């Protein structure tokens, strides 16, 4: 992937617009995980070290497009910057109305309000994209988590700015995924959990071609158990994808659980019963791995040199069905392998077990992370590549 890098651009005293991913979880006005904010900091700090006209914008949640809704405002993000990061970035101000121009106050970082409040954002509207472009001399795409979205602030804006480049976080994300997928040190192990095979079918098919072991968990594993003829009771599984699961089992080394933890009810207080997979009753549902299955996975992980992790292997939100995900998480954390993890539930598990600093790279992407693994071209990256081709390498001496 060949894009103009932020580090290659003359940023001195330029108007810089950074499209970051500040889509953080917020409860009662309080940010519950600031991981994405901190991941964006290096790019913001680099911009501030070169210019006193730096703007950052992002989406947050899913408001009705074109309508202001205070519950989706970036104000809590601004508050977080002011309270926790002022020593690193200085003053911060939220700007609500910015499409027709901005009144600058020197040495302030401007946070431009939620882009999804702007009509046309989600349809990649060119008129809106041109308004974004008019605000800046340099556009920095740093929102890997939104790189799969064809929207005005992530895609079309790059067609109309003088210089469009990749931010530090975007470069790190791509480099980490390339390291895991393009030339992995072997053995390579992928862990794919979640509720449905259908939602991760292309991921499973892509990974089956490159990994040495493909570990499946959650509802995905249930479909593979059913493909082997096991009764999965009232567990979540997809009967229509049993033939697909059988095909994957032939093409890839997929260790299927031999024992599981089940319950007759789905609740936080449900009793956990460990059983061989041949003993599951019709009124029971699989909610976690059993001890022998966990040991088998740990043995595989202990020998791995590259680990890609997306999704829990059980209902880890319930304490009685947390063991599988916790043991797998700790094994990855304690491994000497290069490890990369991504996806919303995966990040929740990483935070719950406090292992973020022990994973080689924790991706900020969810959908973008999965689509990259699938081998899809991410639109925001594609347009940055096209922008560089259009510039033909001549971007350092542009008259801003």
Curated annotation (Swiss-Prot):
EC number of this enzyme: 2.7.2.3
Pathway given in the UniProt record: Carbohydrate degradation; glycolysis; pyruvate from D-glyceraldehyde 3-phosphate: step 2/5
Pfam families for the chain: PGK (PF00162)
Primary residence: cytoplasm
Subunit organization: Monomer.
Family according to the record: Belongs to the phosphoglycerate kinase family.
Protein name: Phosphoglycerate kinase
Species this chain originates from: Blochmanniella floridana
Gene: pgk
């Amino acid at each position: 992937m060949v894009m103009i890098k932020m580090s290659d651009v003359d940023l001195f005293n330029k108007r810089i617009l950074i499209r970051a991913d500040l889509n953080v979880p917020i409860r009662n006005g309080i940010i519950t995980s600031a991981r994405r904010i901190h991941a964006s900091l290096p790019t913001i700090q680099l911009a501030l070290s070169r210019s006193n006209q730096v703007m950052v914008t992002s989406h947050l949640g899913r408001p009705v497009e074109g309508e202001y809704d205070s519950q989706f405002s970036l104000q809590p993000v601004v508050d977080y910057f002011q309270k926790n990061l002022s020593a690193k970035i200085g003053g911060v101000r939220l700007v609500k109305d910015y499409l027709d121009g901005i009144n600058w106050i020197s040495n302030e970082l401007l946070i431009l309000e939620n882009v999804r409040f702007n009509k046309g954002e989600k349809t990649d509207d060119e008129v809106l994209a041109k308004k974004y472009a008019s605000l800046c001399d340099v556009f920095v795409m740093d929102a890997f988590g939104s790189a799969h979205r064809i929207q005005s602030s992530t895609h079309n804006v790059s067609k109309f700015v003088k210089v469009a480049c990749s931010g530090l976080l975007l470069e790190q994300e791509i480099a980490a995924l390339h390291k895991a997928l393009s030339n992995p040190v072997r053995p390579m192990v992928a862990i794919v959990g979640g509720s449905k095979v259908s939602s991760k079918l292309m991921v499973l098919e892509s990974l089956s071609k490159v990994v040495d072991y493909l570990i499946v968990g959650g509802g995905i594993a249930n479909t593979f158990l059913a493909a082997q003829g096991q009764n999965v009771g009232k567990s979540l599984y997809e009967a229509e994808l049993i033939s697909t699961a059988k095909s994957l089992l032939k093409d890839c080394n997929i260790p299927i659980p031999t024992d599981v933890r089940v319950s007759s009810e789905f609740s936080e207080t449900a009793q956990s019963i460990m059983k061989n997979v041949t003993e599951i009753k019709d009124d029971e549902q699989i909610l976690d791995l059993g001890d022998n299955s966990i040991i088998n996975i740990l043995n595989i992980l202990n020998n791995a040199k590259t680990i890609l992790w997306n999704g829990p292997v059980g209902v880890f939100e319930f304490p009685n069905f947390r063991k599988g995900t916790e043991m797998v998480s700790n094994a990855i954390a304690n491994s000497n392998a290069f490890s990369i993890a991504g996806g919303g539930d995966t990040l929740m598990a990483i935070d719950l077990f406090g292992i973020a600093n022990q994973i080689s790279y924790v991706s900020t992407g969810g959908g973008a992370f999965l689509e990259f693994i699938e081998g899809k071209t991410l639109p925001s990256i594609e347009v940055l590549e096209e922008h560089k081709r259009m510039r033909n390498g001549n971007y350092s001496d542009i008259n801003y």
